[in-house]
A protein has these predicted regions:
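Exposed, low-structure sequence patches enriched in small/polar residues
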Residues: 1-319
Length: 319
């Protein structure tokens, strides 16, 4: 029963399919005929997996030592966590015929407009390891070219449309983004348990077509960008706990000063007794430690951004 409950990439629930059809007919004193036909369809696939985390060195005994923990904890996933694909299409056909409102026998010809959109979306989430995660997403928008005017030759129409579909349509825009997050295992080193570090890189790519009438002359426009972010946190309170003397000084609340003041009060009227020696060096050093080591946390962040835009680009991406 447990095996049957595991997600499979061929499970029926991973797929979805929709289709709709609508037709609008209108006419009035000015318009003899107005027909609008819309076909809409969508197909989607979503796979959510629970891949097993592989730890090849988990049972290696000599790696039990503290300074080898980062090797022992090495792990990876053999498959992506999530993959989705979705494609939608909208086919619009509009035919309009104006009414002849003159007394002359004027032949009125209908005007026809066609627009066939085709969108595709891809996403991928892959946890390469527990500390290394990769995300990717892409969207493509294209047009399926149809012969203009009324359909007079059905075979020619089908051939033109099928050739456009096989070429994934005439690409209009293509966008993709990816993100890589890494929790650096620096805290697994014994001397650096008090340090945590994360690194992240985000990248984008955009391709935009120019108008079809000037595309050969002006080309297309591409643009990309990259963002790198490095964040480091120093948990000094954890560091102090590893230094016993500093730990005691930081956590003390002036108890030592109270003990030193009590004998002075008892002997305030005794001018012949020897006054207790005051360790000014210790007082100064402890005070300095409290000031210096009173700082709990330090956070450091580094960020770098870059980008490029290039007009007049001729090639098209594979989408």
């Amino acid at each position: 029963a447990n095996d049957n409950s595991k997600p499979r990439f061929w499970d029926v629930e991973n797929f979805d399919l929709t289709y709709s059809y609508s037709k609008t007919e209108e006419s009035d004193i000015d318009i003899e005929k107005y027909d609008k036909i819309v076909h809409s369809g969508a197909f989607g696939y979503t796979y959510n997996a629970e891949p097993k985390n592989i730890k090849p060195f988990e049972k290696v005994r000599f790696l039990n030592k503290k300074y080898l923990t980062f090797i022992k904890d090495f792990n990876f996933y053999y498959a992506p966590k999530t993959f989705t694909f979705r494609t939608t299409t909208d086919k619009n056909y509009t035919e309009r015929l104006l009414r002849n409102k003159t007394e002359d026998a004027i032949i009125m010809k209908p005007s026809v407009s066609r627009l066939w959109n085709w969108n595709r979306t891809y996403t991928l989430k892959y946890d390469l390891a527990t500390s290394l995660k990769f995300d990717y997403a892409a969207t493509a928008n294209s047009y399926i070219d149809e012969p203009s005017g009324l359909m007079t030759n059905q075979d020619f129409y089908k051939q033109q449309v099928w050739n456009s579909i096989k070429g994934l349509g005439r690409l209009n825009t293509f966008n993709q983004t990816f993100s890589l997050n890494w929790t650096v295992p620096i805290s697994k080193l014994p001397l650096l348990k008090w340090v945590s570090m994360t690194a992240k890189y985000d990248g984008t790519f955009n391709w935009t077509a120019s108008a079809a009438s000037v595309q050969e002359r002006l080309g297309n426009t591409i643009q990309n960008s990259g963002n790198m972010n490095l964040t480091t946190s120093f948990r000094l309170s954890r560091l102090y706990d590893n230094i016993p003397y500093v730990k005691n000084v930081v956590k003390s609340r002036g108890r030592g000063n109270t003990q030193q003041r009590q004998p002075q009060n008892k002997q305030a009227n005794d001018t012949t007794s020897n006054k207790p020696k005051v360790n000014y060096g210790k007082i100064i050093s402890d005070g300095a430690i409290k000031i210096i080591f009173g700082l709990k946390d330090i956070n450091f962040s580094y960020q770098a951004n870059n980008g490029t835009i290039l007009p007049g680009f001729i090639p098209e991406p594979n989408n």
